Amino acid sequence: NVYWLTYEPSPDPGLRMPRRDAPPDPVLAVSPFYSTTVRLEEDEYYRSQLPWTEASDHWLWDRTIYPSSRPTLTFAVELSSLSTLVPYEALFSASIVGYFTYGDHCVQFSLNGSPSSLDSYIWSDDSRKDEQLVHIPFDSSILRDGMNELRIDGCLSDTTLDFIYYDWFELDIRRNYEADNDTLAFKVAEEGWQYQLDGFATKAVEI
């Protein structure tokens, strides 16, 4: 049920919305999943010169130094209620910035121990230190319901030292309509669908 609560400083009563039942419609199809973006971001390092532009976000999460002291990073990614109805093309995105190198920057991304799951990203920015927005599509079958591991490795290029900072990571995925801790947030992209929501502790649900 939806209610419209208003306040009007006059003697007339405010507008009221009637109560209306909305039982399942046997004609409308049930939406099988919804699309969402899972974002991973923490502010651990402040670098005023990274990225190069003043208006950029200068708080960064972590770094790799290849091949010497810190060539690899791993991040735990917990995903729930993944839609496995049909395979689809998921999307991995990252915001990264090169800090120091003698040549090209190179980084390899992988998910759940599969070196071919994502891809390497190579770029050269000389001394500008611009933000790089990485977008890599991948097969959804690589994802696991539960804990996933994102691994980042520095990789061989034409340099002897490669220093890279990482700001955030995103996964564009599909999920089932199942509540997490009695909460479920999703966007309705178009009309003509009905939605079956599961996983709530009680039948009384606020929308």
Model-derived segments and spans:
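Structured catalytic cores of large enzymes
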Residues: 1-206
